[in-house]
Amino acid sequence: MSKVAVVTRTHNRPLFLARVLKTVAEQTFSDYVHLIVNDAGSPDAVRAAVAQLPAAAQSRVEVINNEVSHGREAAVNPGFSRAGEMGVTYVAVLDDDDSWEADFLTDCVAWLDSKPDYVGVASRTTLVYEEINREGSAVVELRRGPLAPDKHTVALEDILQVNWVPPVSLLFRAETLPKLTGWREDLPVLSDWDFFLRMLLLGPVGFIDSPLANWHHRANAVGDDGNSVVVAAQDHNDFHAIIRDQALREALTCTASPSTQPDLKTLAQPLLLAHYAKALREENERLTQQLKELQLQQRERNEEIVRYFDEKTQRLSAQLGEVGESVLLLHERMNSMGFKARWRRLFHRG
């Protein structure tokens, strides 16, 4: 029995599938099973990608073929079900277009082994911006940087506002799956946020402040090659509101089915408060930015006024200097022509 199940959903993305198979095969932790959920894609393409791995890595891969796709979010659940059947201790969701550093599983497993009261642990995530070359034969990295560099702990308060812990960064206990019942299949996006919110109701999630997870983004990719956070950006905005609305409706009407499982109705008020807190913070940031721009404009205007009067003063000083020189010159010329003596004689007669 493997200790960790890594669930990867894929659909006709052989370029990414080859990369994710490689990143898992290169983990320094080897007590895992890699569950590939082929969501109604080409089985031959998946087999070909797996065949490129060393024999030891191939033996740790199991492919689950969905004949019919029930949606991107639903594709995770067959992997969860299989992980439960296998009796693993920990589970991770690693999408086919993301990657890990070699010590991700080693460090996360060690952390959870030492913290039995925690339901999961997340590592710091690196945002990797990339594009597919024109030939479609390679992925080219453009730049990278840390995701949420100001965060150093996983707090429900923060996740209520926005999920800065993507699936690629999270390892959680398999024993939570019966209570969480997987990702919601009625949502086209944000099932990971909904799942993570409900997980945080079960217990705390730790944080490893080392960049062990890589979340890959392709701003210009479309179709199968795109990221949902990019190609379905409007859906993310819409369903963020829909999830909050559902939680509030369940809380107000008590329509949620009674059970011991965590559900969103318990988060209705916190979700709304977090949403408005986020809106207020963004408005404050907008107003602060406007104030900075106004202050900059005023400073530039003041500098223009100072420059204007400096130039005027310099011109006046120059003109006065010219007048002074003219007066001196006139005085010298008058002296040279005897005007001073004549003036004295004229004044003396008077």
Segments predicted by a language model, with ranges:
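Nucleotide-sugar donor-binding/catalytic module of glycosyltransferases
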Residues: 1-237
